[in-house]
């Protein structure tokens, strides 16, 4: 339901600005990090056959594994590769999709599948350096049939860029937990690094009828209210 999404309180914005308080936590990245179970997980699909995954090998440049069609019918499987860093110092989703491959298999057939990982697989945007950076250390490369159906996991070590942690010493409990519904203004401003923009508008010849709603002037409200009711933008 829409009420279960992290953007429920901020989208669509009706002012001059739209606040994306959910940050990185969109779709499955929110559901998995915050522990919210959807009806169907990201990547889920049905098939007339079944598949087994085995013999995973991974490096920072890619992952390979053997996929076997264990059913009685021919079929296709989409192998999905997720990357996670359980000991991350930078807040991030529990795991993120970084690659996938579709493989066609006859009944009983096995194939070796390779999914490449590029330089974007481990990086994050650092607001202090204004550049893409990599947090060094161990990462889990998870292979599965959906974000919830992880079949194999391998650990790789990735060299970091040594950038400072832009969130060190900052209180961001909603973002570190991924539970980004109802983020308070103070925490949002801490992450934003500046005050929340004021949506009130100055009355001048360039303002639109829609902006009358955001003026502090009672006169603007008197004009806007009947117009909005007439156009059914208010109940």
PLM region spans:
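Intrinsic-disorder/low-complexity, polar/charged segments enriched in Ser/Thr/Lys/Arg/Asp/Glu/Gln
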Residues: 61-62, 110-112, 151
């Amino acid at each position: 339901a829409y009420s279960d999404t992290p953007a429920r309180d901020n989208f669509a914005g009706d002012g001059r600005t739209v606040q994306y308080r959910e940050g990185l936590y969109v779709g499955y990245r929110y559901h998995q990090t915050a522990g919210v179970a959807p009806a169907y997980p990201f990547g889920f699909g049905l098939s007339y056959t079944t598949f087994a995954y085995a013999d995973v090998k991974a490096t920072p440049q890619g992952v390979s594994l053997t996929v076997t069609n264990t059913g009685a019918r021919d079929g296709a499987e989409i192998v999905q590769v997720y990357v996670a860093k359980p000991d991350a110092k930078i807040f991030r989703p529990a795991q993120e999709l970084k690659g996938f491959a579709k493989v066609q298999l006859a009944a009983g057939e096995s194939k070796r599948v390779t999914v490449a990982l590029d330089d974007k697989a481990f990086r994050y945007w650092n607001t202090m350096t204004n550049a893409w950076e990599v947090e060094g250390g161990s990462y889990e490369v998870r292979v599965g049939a959906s974000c919830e159906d992880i079949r194999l996991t391998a650990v790789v070590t990735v060299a970091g860029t040594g950038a400072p942690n832009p969130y060190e010493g900052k209180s961001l409990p909603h973002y570190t937990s991924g539970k980004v519904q109802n983020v308070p203004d103070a925490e949002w401003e801490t992450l934003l690094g500046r005050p929340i923009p004021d949506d009130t508008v100055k009355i001048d010849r360039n303002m639109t009828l829609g902006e009358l709603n955001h003026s502090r002037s009672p006169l603007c409200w008197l004009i806007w209210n009947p117009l909005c009711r007439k156009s059914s933008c208010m109940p």
